[in-house]
Each structure stands twice: as C-alpha cells, then as structure tokens.
Amino acid sequence: MSLSDILSEIDGGDDKKVEKLLLKYNTENSRTFAFDLEEEGARIKLCQGLLTVLRRSDLPLCQSTCLETLRILSRDKHVLGPVATKEGMLTLAGLARICVAGHEGEPLEEAQSAEEERVVVEALKCLCNVVFNSVPAQQMGGDLQLAEGLCPRLHLVSASHHEVGLFSLRLLFLLSALRTDVRSTLQKEAGAVKLLTNVLERTLDVRWVGPYEAAPPDPEAPPIPPENNELTMEALKALFNLTMSDSCDKDSLHKLRLIAGIMRHLLMLKTHSEEKTEETHSHAINLLSNLPVQCLDVLIDVPVQGGLEKYRGKNMDTVQILLDFMIKRIDKGFNFKEGLTPVLSLLTESARYHREIRRYIKAQILPPLKDVKERPEIGDTIRNKLVRLMTHVDMAVKQGAAEFLFVLCKESVDNLLKYTGYGNAAGLLMARGLLAGGRGETQYSSDEDSDTEEYKSVKPFINPITGHVEDPLPNPLDEMTEEQKEYEAQRLVSMIDELSRKELIRPMGVRKDGTLAPLGQAIHDCSLASSGSDSD
C-alpha cells in the first residue's frame, strides 16, 4: 500500500475513499513494528493527515479506522511530532471522551453504540502508545491534566465496558509511571488511590467482614474471569506507582491497610491458569512491598477467620502462600532479580517487624539442625536453596537471600553461621561490619533458639567455614621432614609477597570493630589499642 495514495485521498477530502485505503493499510501492517526509514517523512505527513480527518469527520467507522492506522504508526517514536502537540493530544483526548484542563469533552456515558465505543477504545490505545513513546507527549499530557481527567472514569470501570476500563487504567499507569508530578497530583488532589482501591473491590467482589478483613473466598467459587483479572493487574500496576511515597498520616495508613486487606484476599484467589495466577500474585506482592511495614499485620490479623494458637491466634495462610510463591520462583532458576527479590524483600521486612511471621517462616525454612554431614548449600531443602543464592553473581539476589536468612536468625551472627557456614555468610558480614561476630541493630524478642541433641553432639567437629562436619583428611605435613616444611613455608611467603607487590592480592585483617582493613593497618590499630589499654 502506497502512503502517497493515502495522502492524496486525504488532501482530496473524500473520507469514504480514505477509509477504504486505510482499512487495507491496517490489514497489511497490523503486526508491523519495524518501519522503513526511507518512508519516515511520509509517515509523519500521514500522522498529520489522520489528525485532520479525525477533526473533520463525525462518522464512527471512519474515526476508528483512522485511529487504528494512527495506533500502528505510533509504534515508531520518530514520527510522533504532529501527535505530541497540544492540538494532537486534544484531538485524541476528545475522541477518548476524556475531559482535560480547560476543554470540556463529551462524557463517556453518551457513547451508546458499539461503533462509538470502538472509537473510544482506539483513541485510548493511541494515547497509550504515544505517551509511552514520546517525551513531549508525556509533557503535554501533564500540562493538559490528562491523568486527572481519567479519574472520574474509574467509577465506571467494569467488565461490561472491559476495553474502555482496561486501556483507561493502562493509560493512567503509564502517565503515573513516567511523570512524578502527575503521580503526586493523583495522590494528593485527585484521590486516585481510593478510586483504584474501589476498582479492585468491585472487580474482585470483595465483601468486608471486619475493618480490614475480607470474607474468605468460597472454595467452590470459579476462578477470576480473564477480563476481571486483566482489570485487576492494570489497577495494581497503577496503585504501585501511587504508593511509592512514604506518606504515613492517619488517613493514608487507613487507605493502605485497606489495600493490604484486598491483597490478602487476592492472594487467596485463583485465575483461569496457573501462569496468570502467578502473574497476578506477583503484582500483588510488588504492591505489598510498597506499603509501610506496620500495615502488614493485616495479612495475619483476621479475627473472624481465626488463626493458630501457637502464633498468638494469627492466621498464617497468606504467609504460606508467599513462601510457596518464593519457592516457585527459586525453582525456576532464572530471572531472580525481577522475579524473586520483591517477594524476598516483602518476607524479610514482614519477619523483621512481626514476631509471629518470623517464627512461622523460621519453622519452615530453618528448623532445628540435626544432620550436618553435608554443606549448607547442598541439598533440596528451602535452606539449601537460599544458601546457594547467598553466593549468586547478582548483588541484589545474594544480598536479598542473605538478609532474609539473617533476619530469620534474629540478626545473630552465631545463629546465621550455624545455618550457612562462614564462607557463605562472609559477604553479608563484611557489608554489615560483623566479621568479628555480634548482632545487627534490630531488637528482637528474647526467646532463645534451642539446639537438638544431634547438633550438640557434633558441634565441636563442625568446620565453621563450610558449616558441616568434614571427613578427617590426612595431614600432608606428617609426611614431610622439617627441611621440607621450612622450604614450603618460604616458598609460600615468596608467592604471597610477589602477588602483593604486583597488587594482584591485598592481605587483609579484621579491625576490632569487625570491619576489614589492609593487614598492616589492622595490626597497627590493634597494637595501638593494646598499648593504650596497658598504660596507666
């Protein structure tokens, strides 16, 4: 399809012929995402021409066809100049029935026919593409208060107008993700957090039985319908952006506790496929990670449903779901940074500040040790898998796994080493300045960990570096004469000296405060401390 033919018909003013040519173009390019550079100028002119047709035509079929073409063209960020202007954005906002600053648009309620609704949907899709691909369009969207104009529509989001709701939520997500000023306005002035929370309540059919406790789902209830699940995920993504600030006033905490209650309800639900369930739960976990830690007690405090007596009546169903999710992500064996670190972080902070959660998780992951014949990183238990991650190449992953286990050990270095071995924990201890032992800064309850009799009996024989009982090895020095020992010692000193002079290695020592320092400096500091303590 020649772009020049389409441009000629647009200039001629025959919208029927334009529509016919555009239908053919759309069919040919529906899956086109890479465009010919030589036709870039023609595509820019076509964008401008399409806006002209959209302003002069009032035929829904012609409008939706033009918008579909514009949506295809908007995949190319280099041709969006005409669309990213005030006039271009106003045209699209008007067709999407969004009221923007200083321009009263036609309300959405008046879009009765399927053809008119198709125009609204295509306009929203265009806006999503244009905002995503064009910084000037993002700026113009902020100036026109496009996101604020979307907020009244959130009252109408439902499965009956699925695509209108879906792309309205997606556009709100994009605007709030790409513009911090828009995010702030939505939080403080537009009441978007409450509106999005209401969307989730309606979409998930939440029925409250307590201040922050939703009625448990019926075991025989069908899974979340696919359309409702799509709306849920878009609302969760938008809420994630809007809960990134640290606002903790009384009203904000109430709203965030409601969100935590809805997330608990959502984690109990299933969708039509295991893959979609995991994706939805992943968005819920991301959102929970944004909430202040004092709101997370909502996950376990459900008086109507009740809980476990050994955990002071707290309900651990949600915590178990989070643990199962974490294990599933570990077992996948890839994409740990994006897929695993959010749930690790959530479980870590929950365990750090909620004693019952920590006790429950520790019972699952770090039960009392019995068999210490194998290294901590060898095996298929959750502990083995997490210890392996402590030496992962990705810094965020290794730190997340190490911090999680450290918190489960109440930030006690001795307890951590018991479960992981010094070698696996060295990175965390060095970063925390705890190589000499001690505890972290968080205050924990005084209940003590008890060792099993099996562990106590072999404790003196455990290699503290590897964390397990090693088979006795023959001492190579036993077969050497004194002259051979002296020769090997001198050779070792020479090799270390050569590597040090070439700065390939740097001998390190531990200061009294547990931090690392070059060996000479560490010895000097210790000498000064010793001489100071000996003086009167």
Curated annotation (Swiss-Prot):
It comes from the Eukaryota. GO terms for molecular function: G-protein alpha-subunit binding; guanyl-nucleotide exchange factor activity; protein folding chaperone. It is found in: Cytoplasm, Cell cortex. It holds the Pfam family Ric8. Its main location: cytoplasm. Disulfide bonds: none annotated. One of its GO terms (cellular component) is cytoplasm. Keywords: Chaperone, Cytoplasm, Guanine-nucleotide releasing factor. InterPro entries: ARM-like (IPR011989), ARM-type_fold (IPR016024), Chaperone_Ric-8_A/B (IPR008376), Gua_nucleotide_exch_fac_Ric8 (IPR019318). GO terms for biological process: G protein-coupled receptor signaling pathway; pigment cell development; sensory perception of smell. Chaperone that specifically binds and folds nascent G(s) G-alpha proteins (GNAS and GNAL) prior to G protein heterotrimer formation, promoting their association with the plasma membrane. Also acts as a guanine nucleotide exchange factor (GEF) for G(s) proteins by stimulating exchange of bound GDP for free GTP. Acts as an important component for odorant signal transduction by mediating GNAL (G(olf)-alpha) folding, thereby promoting-dependent cAMP accumulation in olfactory sensory neurons. Interacts with GDP-bound G(s) G-alpha proteins GNAL and GNAS. Does not interact with G-alpha proteins when they are in complex with subunits beta and gamma. Belongs to the synembryn family. This is Chaperone Ric-8B. The gene is ric8b.
